[in-house]
Amino acid sequence: MGTTCNVVVLISGSGSNLQALIDSQHEGNPARIRAVIANRADAFGLTRAKGAGIPTAVLDHKAFDGREAFDAALMELIDAHAPDLVLLAGFMRILSPGFVRHYHGRLLNIHPSLLPKYKGLDTHRRALEAGEAEHGCSVHFVTEELDGGPVVLQAA
């Protein structure tokens, strides 16, 4: 990866995780966000990125005939930035096996639960309904199994 780790961040919404990533960019931190890509034009995270001077793009999944066509266009857009890592930060799309394989070993997801508990959606509601005493966040490698890749980091 060299001295700098070029990162492309994918979002769908408010970009609160993106903001934490932006705030962590400082001298001494090798990670550099090179682009933020959203699948929704109304994602507030785009405003956060623009405010930080980070290039943005929108690729609306509804404009494509199926997941594979969208993912192919998304790969082309991502690859134009030559990232070392692709980070899903609230990106609310299930990615095709071909996409996952293309970025194998450099595709990470921020998931709002202590995996392997509460994979998928509605993690906070499910944790509350289960009476969990502890809840947290996981960063994991993306594999073809939904929220099933190796966990890199967890915090409660």
Protein language model regions, located:
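Residue-level detector of anion-binding/catalytic polar loops
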Residues: P55, D84, A133
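Donor/substrate-binding cores of folate-linked one-carbon enzymes
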Residues: S24, A31, N39, A89-A156
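Short beta->alpha connector loops at strand-helix junctions that form conserved
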Residues: A57-K62, I110
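N-terminal glycine-rich "phosphate-gripper" loop used for MgATP/nucleotide binding
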Residues: A38-N39, A63, R67-E68, H81-P97
